[in-house]
Amino acid sequence: MASIFKIHSAYKPAGDQIKAIENIADSFQKGAEKVTLVGVTGSGKTFTMAQVIQNLGLPTLVLSHNKTLAAQLFREFKEFFPENAVEYFVSYYDYYQPEAYVPSSDTFIEKDSSINEEIDKLRLRATSSLLEREDVVIVSSVSCIYGLGSPEEYTNSVVALKTGDTIERDAVIRKLLHIQYNRNDIDFSRGNFRVRGDSIEIYPAYHTDGIRIEFFGDEIDSISRINPITAQTILKLEKTYIYPAKHFITSGPKVKVAIENIKAELEAQALFFRKNDKLLEAERIISRTNYDMEMLQEMGYCNGIENYSRHLTGRKAGERPACLIDYFQGEFLLIVDESHVTIPQIGGMFAGDKARKQTLVDFGFRLPSALDNRPLNFEEFETLTPKTLYVSATPADYEMEKSSKVVEQIIRPTGLLDPIVEVRSTKNQIEDLLVEIRKRIDVGERILITTLTKKMSEDLTDYYKEIGLQVAYLHSEVETLDRVAIIRDLRKGIYDVLIGINLLREGLDIPEVSLVAILDADKEGFLRNYKSLIQTVGRAARNVNGTAILYADKITDSMAKAIDETKRRRKIQEDHNLKFGITPLTIRKEVNDIIEREEKKRTSEDLVLEDVEKKFNSKKFPNKEVLKDKLREEMMKAAKELDFERAAILRDKMLSIQINDPSTEN
């Protein structure tokens, strides 16, 4: 029987991929629930995953431990499965400060957040795809275990419209309002609809095209997909389904019942506080909850509404919330990428969330039912995901013990060997590393540097910038889509060096990187243990000149183990290449945006700076003085041509170089 998935790739399975794909698919087809793939960096684990998905023909959830790697996997699976639905589901917050209370200083911190509209659209598209079709691959972060609206309520709220249906225009408007669309006849943007005479134009929250519904009396005369900017028809449709604009949908009757239940819980909690002489807490919970209930009655919404989700969805005390996993209908496959990191992360989410909320409950800021607005605990997660493939270069004991089959993938299809590992003294490590960096830059290769602290990363970035290197610092405060852009710019050569702490280990796929430098490699701990070292060294495994330099004054047990394992794998790979006459080749991959996003309008400043970057890339000049002279020359030329805006931007660029270099005279 033909698979519902179809891979598009110029490559065929090679190296250890052939046996790995066969063994994994065969194990699952024979009833195995847990399988582990131990695959070295650059061995094509993602391609193996795609082949397994195609062979099994099951809807698939791919779980990654951070947004950057999830975005990279999303791009790769989209390229493998262009005819299928490949979706992206991560937290839509650019910034998130959860509600919290600090008893020691009597400080209450209000919830504060900033939502990324593009990611919100992708999340909604993911759930709509799961309801529409079976050939779906969703790449997700740990966000998939957090509470989401009930799939039953979500499905029941879908507005189905068909040409020839008899329905009043106003009835369609009411349905759209119920599923959280806003009527706005002026601003036709995502999640809004407008009414123009006998037609309604809807901009679905999960799509880039609009939908026009035209009526003739009380009958739907035509349905069209339209360009949301020009309103021109793209395609005539026989029918359409409008999915809710938000995941949390609750009907009016349910809200009334929920309010009654919340008031009953409030009464019991206030009585509990009074019995324990906690009068302040009693007054606090009464005033806060009553205010929320007034807002809910009048507006159908209140700040922190998620804290009442148990009542709004009709769950029992302690019952788990619905999450993305519940939207998978029937049998599906879970792939846990970099499982040695992702599995512990899943286990830690529940405990961290409960600790914060318990304090809010104890001091009267929230009702006890707020504790049920939570991520899944680990046991619930295991129960929901019976068919699981763990993927890692360094799987933990948990995965190995749970798996009925462990498959190794050491031989790379490209014949590439594991990197050469060198250990060097920390004495003059920055200058020594600079020499190695310049060697790589001269031949168009890239460099990753990993440090132990944020301050060291920042200082090193500043130092290398001052001496003219094109360097970027990747850290946790950089927004999700901007991290993706930095990695793309490294591949394109806008940057030569990328510096980070914990973001340069698992999964980053950058074939141009030929050198990985690990500073303070002998400082045993989370970032310098065996698994971390293996993962970090592996970042150079996609380049034929791959080298890892470990700066250390002693060889720790973790270093020795990592070096020995790298040598073991390298020997197996060398023997294989010798036997079959294979010449190693650097992986060649196109440089694309990992996540396609709507093009933002660029300002004239953006365009000028881009031009400056191309013309006056600092690495082309022997020193900063020459670079400044060139910028000054260009500035005077722009002023002479009366292009004062360009001249001002060039002046600012020139001054910024002076500011960064105090030793330079004006």
Curated annotation (Swiss-Prot):
Residues 429-591 form the Helicase C-terminal domain. Its main location: cytoplasm. It comes from the Bacteria. GO terms for molecular function: ATP binding; ATP hydrolysis activity; DNA binding; excinuclease ABC activity; helicase activity. SUPFAM superfamilies: C-terminal UvrC-binding domain of UvrB, P-loop containing nucleoside triphosphate hydrolases. CDD domains: DEXHc_UvrB, SF2_C_UvrB. GO terms for cellular component: cytoplasm; excinuclease repair complex. Pfam families: Helicase_C, ResIII, UVR, UvrB, UvrB_inter. Coiled coil: none annotated. A motif (Beta-hairpin) lies at residues 92-115. SMART domains: DEXDc, HELICc. ATP binds at residues 39-46. InterPro entries: Helicase/UvrB_N, Helicase_ATP-bd, Helicase_C-like, P-loop_NTPase, UVR_dom, UVR_dom_sf, UvrB, UvrB_inter. Keywords: ATP-binding, Cytoplasm, DNA damage, DNA excision, DNA repair, Excision nuclease, Helicase, Hydrolase, Nucleotide-binding, SOS response. It is found in: Cytoplasm. One of its GO terms (biological process) is nucleotide-excision repair. The UvrABC repair system catalyzes the recognition and processing of DNA lesions. A damage recognition complex composed of 2 UvrA and 2 UvrB subunits scans DNA for abnormalities. Upon binding of the UvrA(2)B(2) complex to a putative damaged site, the DNA wraps around one UvrB monomer. DNA wrap is dependent on ATP binding by UvrB and probably causes local melting of the DNA helix, facilitating insertion of UvrB beta-hairpin between the DNA strands. Then UvrB probes one DNA strand for the presence of a lesion. Belongs to the UvrB family. Forms a heterotetramer with UvrA during the search for lesions. Interacts with UvrC in an incision complex. The beta-hairpin motif is involved in DNA binding. This is UvrABC system protein B.
